[in-house]
From Swiss-Prot:
NCBIfam families: L21. This protein binds to 23S rRNA in the presence of protein L20. GO terms for molecular function: rRNA binding; structural constituent of ribosome. It comes from Bacteroides thetaiotaomicron (strain ATCC 29148 / DSM 2079 / JCM 5827 / CCUG 10774 / NCTC 10582 / VPI-5482 / E50). The gene is rplU. GO terms for cellular component: cytoplasm; ribonucleoprotein complex; ribosome. GO terms for biological process: translation. The keyword Cell membrane does not apply. This is Large ribosomal subunit protein bL21. Keywords: Ribonucleoprotein, Ribosomal protein, RNA-binding, rRNA-binding. Belongs to the bacterial ribosomal protein bL21 family. The keyword Ribosomal protein applies. Part of the 50S ribosomal subunit. Contacts protein L20.
Length: 105
């Protein structure tokens, strides 16, 4: 059984026991339980239910493993030729690591 769930504006395929890295969730503590009710599709033993826009009564229950995981550093370099203008910016996205405990449909 799996579900397509929307978390912080991104869609993920969620199955029980799976680990997900999602964009940082404000206020979630390590070890706490988080529920996502914006389920777009549920597949239960080949029986597919598609929501319009969401499936009623369906939710995905997750446990927070680590609330602050930093991604790889992304470097952005700007340059204008012959003018000596150079600028370097770096960014590290913060993620939350989740383990899916169950998919309720």
């Amino acid at each position: 059984m799996y579900a397509i769930v929307e978390i912080n504006g991104q869609q993920f395929k969620a199955e029980a026991g799976q680990k997900l890295f999602v964009h940082h969730i404000e206020g979630a503590e390590n070890g706490s339980t988080v529920e996502f009710e914006k389920v777009l599709l549920v597949d239960k033993d080949g029986n597919v239910t598609v929501g319009a826009p969401t499936v009623e009564g369906a939710k995905v229950v997750c446990q927070v493993i680590s609330n602050l995981v930093k991604g790889d550093k992304v470097l952005v370099f700007h340059k204008k030729r012959r003018k000596g203008y150079r600028k370097l910016n770096g960014h590290r996205q913060q993620f939350t690591e989740l383990t899916i405990t169950e998919v309720v449909a």
